Amino acid sequence: MSVPNKTTVLVIGGGPAGSYAAAVLARENVDTVLLEAEKFPRYHIGESMLASMRFFLRFIDLEEQFDAYGFQKKYGATFKINSKREAYTDFSASLGPGGYAWNVIRSEADDLIFRYAGEQGAHIFDGTKVDDIEFLSYDGADGANFTPAAFLVNPGRPVAATWSRKDGTRGRIKFDYLIDASGRAGIISTKYLKNRTVNEGLRNIANWSYWKGAKVYGEGSDQQGSPFFEALTDGSGWCWAIPLHNGTLSVGVVMRQDLFFGKKKAAGSPGSLEMYKLCLQSVPGISGLLEDAEIVSDVKMASDWSYSASAYAGPHFRVAGDAGCFIDPYFSSGVHLALVGGLSAATTIQAVRRGETSEFSAAKWHSSKVTEGYTRFLLVVMAVLRQLRKQNAAVITDDKEEGFDTAFGLIQPVIQGQADTGESEQQRMVAGVQFSLERFGQATPEAQRALLDKVQFAGQNAEELEKLTADELAVLHNIIGRQLKMTKVEKNLDNFTRDVIDGWAPRVERGKLGLQRADTSIMTAEMKDLFQLNRSLDSTKAGIQLPA
């Protein structure tokens, strides 16, 4: 089949965000075309999945097929931050006893989801690169509302795209809606909006390779076979060791870019393999796993800068996954955030097509949702990386605690992806984000504890938010505002469906996908404003930086 001349929704990019969005829309009987620049299967890094992935796959009936493929089971993850005892995040907390996610070979996992989107009815084409997007002015009744204040932009409405292939074939396709899931290339953000901002505190560089014959981490313990993340002893970065189902161990080092090149220069500018092995000398735990192993691939290197954008939506377009934002992969958040963005894009497009809400409201919901997810991980990652770089200073733990159990207990709903999927208590969610903020010194601990008490109490007494001082409001604007009413329910995408933004909540049901009015009768106007997710922290403006 050749690329059609017209479609309802054009998806750019066949990674997790794009393929998932295409599968969701196709199952809603929406004419969907997916164009992927690379020929699948293609190599990609980012091999460790979060517990939340099961729930996203379950919604599109892909969970059983994905599980049967044979990917390495992941029951949790282990983190060695300094000389204290390792921290372990157990997936049974969100998946039940014996529950697991997976470590995957991304070329195979991404291809599986990409092909599945085609099986569900999407028209999928790999080796087909989108070169340009055509826009028409958008002068709708709500056009003036697409402003930076609403975390939106109005470059016009995209109406067509031109594409090309390596064999010289070219074409043009018209569409009603566009989802940009083009990965780091981010055609909308980088070529047209030019609104991408790099987080200066997270300019890192990654070097990695694959090993055969490595020892198994935690052999004989309940953490046996766990992915292992270990801080470099000099505080310059961290290292991953992720076991894969083909018998290899993925081992990579993430370092601050300036420190990496400084170390390389001091060592006489060694080659990539020698430099990689030099860095591994700073992770005794992982080096021990590699004692009798052999390296079986070239050393790969990539910039690992974290970035975000000022908006992730506009008239008739949505941006999802790495096309919009990327956060340091310490907690393996990439695919999780991609799936959240893909589902949000599909949901908000359907809400408009079904006549449930305006294009402005739907676009704002999506941009707010993407901002919220990125910010939540940003806060937690930066708190932990601050501890990692400070090594034995008491940053996320106190001097008397032997490990990091308290810290990881608080941030668990974030780092397992529970905030968007299975059950999670409001107190734990707010406490986890609050815990991270305290570690940045955004306010005194006393002030933040007092504010936390008010925020937690607000679920029962909305009037409390009207009593916040100007200083407290400033701190609250740095907290991921959420109005969550959590009850014990079946583990699925219930937290995603309970996200109320501007009075709208998602309806995640096959055949009924869209947005619906939520009951906000108990919320005052000020409370609604404070808890809008688009008030999430902007990393650049807030000036959150890690210590040198």
Curated annotation (Swiss-Prot):
Residue positions annotated to bind FAD are 14, 17, 47, 335
Q: Cell division as a keyword?
A: no
GO BP of this protein: secondary metabolite biosynthetic process
Q: Which UniProt keywords apply?
A: FAD, Flavoprotein, Monooxygenase, Oxidoreductase
Domain of life, per UniProt, equals: Eukaryota
Where chloride is bound, by residue? 333-334
| Biological or metabolic pathway of the protein | Secondary metabolite biosynthesis
Q: Which gene encodes it?
A: gedL
- Similarity section: Belongs to the flavin-dependent halogenase family.
Functional note: Sulochrin halogenase; part of the gene cluster that mediates the biosynthesis of geodin, an intermediate in the biosynthesis of other natural products. The pathway begins with the synthesis of atrochrysone thioester by the polyketide synthase (PKS) gedC. The atrochrysone carboxyl ACP thioesterase gedB then breaks the thioester bond and releases the atrochrysone carboxylic acid from gedC. The atrochrysone carboxylic acid is then converted to atrochrysone which is further transformed into emodinanthrone.
Protein name per the record? Sulochrin halogenase gedL
Enzyme class, spelled out: oxidoreductase
* Reactions the enzyme catalyzes: sulochrin + 2 FADH2 + 2 chloride + 2 O2 = dihydrogeodin + 2 FAD + 4 H2O + H(+)
Which EC number applies? 1.14.19.-
